[in-house]
Amino acid sequence: SLRMHLETADETFMDASTHGRIKPARVWKALYLDNPRVFERKDEVETPGFSVDILMDASSSRKQMQQKIAAQAYVLSKSLTNCGIPVQIYSYCSIRGYTVMHIFKEYDDYGVEDELFHFVAAGNNRDGLALRAASHLMELSPKPKKLLFMFSDASPQDDQIAGEGAFYKDREYTDALAVKDTVNEVQRLKNHGIDVIGIFMGSAH
């Protein structure tokens, strides 16, 4: 859970102070400028030691909920960013057999969350392939620990026949086969130390 990841790493900064270890180069300030801050003190600042990625299912089954999905991702991103946690956001859908990743926000972007309101749902969804792509995008994280939120209806499906390179080649990406592929990719992420949290966004009906 997110609470488990709220472990912090202490970063040490040297700051001018009225007490601590004397800094000879600053003594003249006390003599001529009446500035008593001629000492150096270590200040420890707690900073989050992890980053968060938000992966949104943008398939057509999400059409009736696309505004709600965008709003939830917006609030989550703003809250995390305000806590100093790097956030990356992207969506995925499959169109004519190709999985498309739309990046709304990268880790070092600030104030771009409004882009989420351009979120549009269309096409199918190969969840396993999207998770594999997410693992590559998360390699850009500036933090050692990584957490992935996946907004999904937990129903991976694509009726386009897969081509070369997929274990489900020449078969439709549906039912048990699609679920197995998704589970395998989640496990692969976990094996690489990435925690995955599914946020179920079911049918609006």
What are these regions (language model features)?
Residues 1-205:
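Acidic, glycine-rich A-domain
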